[in-house]
């Protein structure tokens, strides 16, 4: 498993377990490795929304849509 895959897996696990701050950290690290991945931007947005950081979450969803306008998960 690559470093990126490990970060994504850990982020998803923490998100599912309700550890939103940890999930956010993993997704931010993953985005440093792959900044043009719309799914990562969407996952970061979900973590931010779960933390009540709605404006930042909206920015992430918009970034995801800029990268892939067909990405319905971020709308």
Predicted regions and their residues:
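Conserved structural position within tetratricopeptide repeats
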Residues: 29-32, 62-66
